[in-house]
Curated annotation (Swiss-Prot):
GO molecular function, one term: 3-isopropylmalate dehydratase activity
Recorded superkingdom: Bacteria
Record GO biological process: L-leucine biosynthetic process
EC number: 4.2.1.33
Similarity section: Belongs to the LeuD family. LeuD type 1 subfamily.
Enzyme class: lyase
One Gene Ontology CC term in the entry: 3-isopropylmalate dehydratase complex
Entries under InterPro entries matching the protein: 3-IsopropMal_deHydase_ssu, Aconitase/3IPM_dehydase_swvl, AconitaseA/IPMdHydase_ssu_swvl, IPMI_Swivel, LeuD
Species this chain originates from: Rhodospirillum centenum (strain ATCC 51521 / SW)
Keyword Amino-acid biosynthesis: yes
Subunit structure: Heterodimer of LeuC and LeuD.
Described function: Catalyzes the isomerization between 2-isopropylmalate and 3-isopropylmalate, via the formation of 2-isopropylmaleate.
Protein name: 3-isopropylmalate dehydratase small subunit
Stored CDD domains: IPMI_Swivel
Length: 203
């Protein structure tokens, strides 16, 4: 998993509440277990019309936000079914941080496991960030996970909190497999001891 330390980039304001995982990545894209290639289907029902043409009014189709790495969204982001493809699609598109007043619990957890930083902030603060993001490519934000602060385009600093263990995992790029591998010496020692003490249990 890629480390998350400091992210500087354009933030796309998505003024929609209750964005569910089917809106993030529709079910027809769930046939794959690969984490790559899903960015093409991100928000596809919002980004494209029935003919496959882009909807010019959707934020990620606007020139200023096509390369956004931060998404600022409405309340209850990531609700609906617990599909891990949702954070995969965001990450494959290039989104590394999502800011919203609240998140669905499973989506929130899946973000941390896949290298995305979800930040929950009070609604008035999110509205302030969205207003600043309206300036498009002329407004860049910096999200500093180590300092737990968001630097707005005008220099104002917004604090946020991340649970210490999750923060450490993101800073170091540790997913579940990475955490297990960190214990490889202890696992090897345990298996060696088992072979000596209980050889019958190993067949």
């Amino acid at each position: 998993m890629e480390k998350f330390t400091v992210l500087t980039g354009v933030a796309a304001p998505l003024r929609i509440m209750n964005v569910d995982t089917d809106m993030i990545i529709p079910a027809r894209y769930l046939k794959t277990i690969k984490r790559t290639g899903l960015g093409a289907g991100l928000f596809s029902s919002l980004r494209f019309d029935d003919t496959g043409a882009e909807r010019p009014d959707f934020v990620l189709n606007q020139r200023a936000y096509r390369n956004a790495t931060i998404l600022i969204a409405g309340d209850n982001f990531g609700c609906g079914s617990s599909r891990e493809h949702a954070p995969w699609a965001l990450l494959d598109y290039g989104i590394r941080c999502v800011i919203a007043p609240s998140f669905a619990d499973i989506f929130f957890n899946n973000c941390f496991k896949n290298g995305i930083l979800p930040i929950a902030l009070p609604e008035p603060v999110v509205e302030k960030l969205m207003a600043a993001a309206d300036n498009g490519a002329n407004a860049t934000f910096t999200v500093d996970l180590e300092a737990q602060r968001i630097a707005m385009p005008d220099g104002e600093s917004i604090p946020f909190e991340v649970e210490p263990f999750r923060r450490e995992c993101l800073l170091n790029g540790w997913d579940d497999i990475g955490l297990t591998l960190r214990q490889s010496e202890r696992i090897d020692a345990y298996e060696a001891r088992q072979r000596t003490e209980q050889p019958w249990a190993l067949g």
